[in-house]
Regions:
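A detector for small-residue-rich transmembrane helices and their helix-helix packing motifs
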Residues: 1-192
Length: 192
C-alpha cells in the first residue's frame, strides 16, 4: 500500500466529486467577470506582493480567470475539458483526481512566490507577475490534457471536427511547443 492509498483511506471522504465541473463553472464565472466588470479581474490575480499585504483571497481567486478571452474558445474548452476531466476522474477516482488538481494549484502558488522572492531578493523589485502575463490557469487545462493523453494515448479526437488525430500526437506537439518556450523563454516562462 503506497502513501496515496493511505492518504485516501484517511482523507478520501473529503474528495470533491465532479471537480472538473466546478473548475469549468469557475472559468465561466471568471469569463463573465472579465466582460461585465473588467476592473474586477485585477482583484482576482495571483499577486504575491498583494497577498503579503493582506489580500489573501488571491490565493484562491486566480483560479477563476479562464485561459481564454474568446467566447467561442471558452465554449470548446468547456466541452473538451468536461469530457477529459470526467474521464480522468472516472479512471483515477475522485480522491486521486482531486490530489492531482489541488497539488498542481499548490505548486503553482509556491512557484509564484518563489519567482517573486527571486526578483525581490536578486533585483530588489516587486514585479507584478500577473501584469506581464506569467500567471494563469492554462496549466490546469494542459495538465488535464496531458494526463488524459498519457492514459489514453490511442484515443482519437476530431481536430476541427474533421481530422481524426490520436491524443499522443496532440500531446507530443504540445510538449515540443512547451519545450521550445522553456528553452527560449526567460525565467518567468521557465517557472510557469
Amino acid at each position: 500500500m503506497n502513501w496515496l492509498d493511505k492518504l485516501e483511506r484517511k482523507l478520501g471522504r473529503f474528495a470533491i466529486p465532479n471537480l472538473t465541473v466546478y473548475l469549468l463553472i469557475g472559468y465561466v464565472i471568471g469569463f463573465g467577470v472579465m466582460y461585465l466588470m473588467p476592473e474586477m479581474v485585477g482583484y482576482l490575480t495571483l499577486e504575491p506582493a498583494l497577498i503579503l499585504r493582506g489580500q489573501v483571497w488571491r490565493l484562491i481567486s486566480w483560479v477563476l480567470i479562464p485561459p481564454t478571452t474568446n467566447l467561442i474558445s471558452l465554449v470548446f474548452l468547456v466541452l473538451l475539458y468536461y469530457s477529459l476531466g470526467t474521464a480522468l476522474e472516472r479512471t483515477w477516482g475522485s480522491f486521486r483526481y482531486n490530489v492531482y488538481i489541488f497539488s498542481g494549484l499548490l505548486f503553482t502558488v509556491l512557484a509564484v512566490f518563489g519567482l517573486y522572492a527571486f526578483y525581490y531578493f536578486r533585483y530588489g523589485v516587486e514585479v507584478p507577475l500577473s501584469v506581464i502575463g506569467l500567471i494563469g490557469t492554462n496549466y490546469i487545462t494542459m495538465s488535464i490534457f496531458l494526463a488524459f493523453a498519457a492514459i489514453y494515448p490511442n484515443m482519437e479526437v476530431m481536430l476541427y471536427f474533421i481530422l481524426p488525430i490520436k491524443m499522443k500526437w496532440m500531446a507530443l506537439v504540445y510538449v515540443v511547443l512547451a519545450g521550445y518556450d522553456f528553452l527560449n523563454g526567460g525565467i518567468g516562462i521557465r517557472v510557469a
